[in-house]
Structures are given as C-alpha cells and as structure tokens.
Amino acid sequence: MSTKTNIQKDWEQREFIEDMSINIQKIVEFLNKFELSTRNKLSDLNEKLTILDRQVDYLEATFKTVQE
C-alpha cells in the first residue's frame, strides 16, 4: 500500500507542478500583451503631448508678439 500511496502522491505533485507551470505561462503571456499594449498607448499619448506642447509654444510666441 505504501508504494501505491507514494505513486499517487507523486502523480498529485506532478499534476500540481504542471498546473502551476501552465498558470505561470498564462500570467507571463498576459503581462507581455499588457506591456505591449501599454507601451503603444503611452507612445501615442507622448506623440499627442508633443503636438500640444508645440502648439502651446506657438501660441505663447504669437501672444508675446501681439503684446509688443
């Protein structure tokens, strides 16, 4: 009986390890997709902020020349 119990415990441990490995892989895939998505969104936001910054600089320069 002890051998059978040991074999059963071994299988349970192997199944647990396999389940953990699969779940870790899923988490890694999610994080990689999230990182890519976030990087793209931040890049788009950076471009928009750069455009807005240039527009503000232009408006400030225009306003200064009008005041003079």
Swiss-Prot record:
Gene Ontology terms for molecular function: identical protein binding; molecular adaptor activity; protein-containing complex binding
GO cellular component, one term: cytoskeleton
InterPro entries reported for this sequence: BRICK1
Source taxon at top rank: Eukaryota
GO biological process, one term: cell motility
Keyword Disulfide bond: no
Keyword Membrane on entry: no
Keyword set, alphabetical order: Coiled coil, Cytoplasm, Cytoskeleton
Compartments, record wording: Cytoplasm, Cytoskeleton
Family recorded in the similarity comment: Belongs to the BRK1 family.
Record text on subunit structure and interactions: Part of a Scar/WAVE complex containing brk1, scrA, abiA, pirA and napA. Interacts with scrA.
Protein name, entry field: Protein BRICK1
Organism of this sequence: Dictyostelium discoideum
